[in-house]
Amino acid sequence: MKLIIENWNRFLNEEKDISSLDSWEHEDAKSYAKELVEKYGDPDVVTDNMVLWKDNRISEFKKVYVIDESIPHDSPAPHHDYVYSTMEIDVPEDLMEAVAKASESIIVDQLKNEVTARCGDIIANAITLGFVQKLIDGDIKPENSEEEYKKYILEGMTPDWFKEK
């Protein structure tokens, strides 16, 4: 029985070939994942429902991953979220509320000092993470975070560190 369970776990955790993208349910996520593969090469990890690039292979992001999902999101304009980008950013406790008010697509992991942006492309994610950095640096007043975030996204204010192929 133990051998059966070990083999089953090995099967479940086995990495898949990039062709697994063809079976994805959400066309927008599938199309964007394929676009990233074209620009940045094969991902480091491929599963049935996710592709992942890590170790700054895409710009300054610690990791970028696309999940076979399409989450409707209306702020600041209607779109769907499926790509996640993570950076090491330490968000002080007193700025957590300002970050939360700025966007529902900003995910803060205080234990790992990481912030993940989820949107429809890595450009919007770079803008979002750059916004969080500016907020922490004091360049944006916490009480203005929601309005400032919309401005950053709508005006395409990419941070200096963002380099796209």
Go through each PLM region and give its residues.
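Non-cytosolic coordination micro-motifs
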Residues: 17-165
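Charge-dense, intrinsically disordered terminal/linker segments
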Residues: 1-16, 38
